[in-house]
Amino acid sequence: MSLSPKQEQLFKQASKHIPGGVNSPVRAFNGVGGTPVFIEKAKGAYLWDVDGKRYVDYVGSWGPMILGHAHPDIIKAVQTAAEDGLSFGAPTVHETTLADIICEIMPSIELVRMTNSGTEATMTAIRLARGYTGRDKIVKFEGCYHGHSDSLLVKAGSGLLTKGEGEPTSKGVPADFAKHTLTLPYNDIAALKECFAKFGHEIAGVIIEPVAGNMNMVKPIDGFLQAIRDVCDEYKSVFIIDEVMTGFRVALGGAQSVYNVKPDLTTLGKIIGAGLPVGAFGGKREIMECIAPLGGVYQAGTLSGNPLAMRAGIEMFKHLRQPDFYSKLSAQLEKLLAGLQAAADEAGIPFKTQQAGAMFGLYFTDQEDITSFDSMLACDIEAFKKFFHGMLKRGVNLAPSAFEAGFISSAHSDEDIEFTIQAAKETFAEMK
């Protein structure tokens, strides 16, 4: 399926020198079929493709465009920063300012280090947990994505609860390396306790998405995050909350503020730079002081704390800290999801939505709750593919995978919400 011959030709040209025609796999539309849409520009809640077609966007560059695309204050901040120089490889006051803001908003973060991406942040947090504890094993959860570092491209293997070993999910990850990562079912407190009872004194840390955004959107059950906090305290393991997707997105203080849990380390993504390439990790002072140059855990980056991202982030936080910013954002999303649910019910299509702040999930299922990767796999993926293409045809851009969360921004108007609901009504009618 292709929107136009021009899109087909552009994808063919891209595939000549770019593997698969894309620079990140999900963009290839393998999860939904068809040809990727090539985007020319974006503004507010909208994208325009190379054919000039406009879309109401619910991807938001995978989360960080919380103010909408090309917000004038962000553009001005970036332009001003660029005029002063793109990169110095030296400290700037803007790094300090943004670090101060992050630590003030998230009390669990006493020290913070900037990186170039969320993957770098989670990769280094794992290294730091190992360096701090002197242990090797890491616990992660099915359906959670923490970037593409070797330690985390791992699934539960047959030797998980006998030998405490994981198996790679990607070629190129050595089995001897992956065996140090244990993968457990999300929201399974019993499995967590069993794992720690067997291997707790070998476990350096636990990393988790507090709201999983890569098996669509799955929220933690009551007590799950606190159970992780408790076993980490008992076995002196490092509790890492990966807020690359949820940080400043589900609430100003991140998911950790919503669920009232305090991690030892937190990882953050490109939202702290208003969508520019940046990440960060931070947490307890005694752990963070193990990072070079204070300690023996190495981390570095020429563009870490780059001035464009720092100044864009500082400007963005001025908006996020305004009274009622998040309550208005959440209310707008509630309106959208209620309309989508009503449209599906009217069409007689099994459909469910979930919301966490300004993140949302859409599921074609009659299950009561979606609480794990297995329950997500039980959803009707083929129905999602039809829905995706029906909405795209009508000018609504959703993530091209049934396993990705959606996002709303402060730029989405009442008219955009109504437009989206009407597109859904027409698409559901077409799917009957």
From Swiss-Prot:
Signal peptide: none annotated. Its cofactor is pyridoxal 5'-phosphate. Its main location: cytoplasm. The modification N6-(pyridoxal phosphate)lysine is found at residue 270. Keywords: Cytoplasm, Isomerase, Porphyrin biosynthesis, Pyridoxal phosphate. It is found in: Cytoplasm. It holds the Pfam family Aminotran_3. Belongs to the class-III pyridoxal-phosphate-dependent aminotransferase family. HemL subfamily. This is Glutamate-1-semialdehyde 2,1-aminomutase.
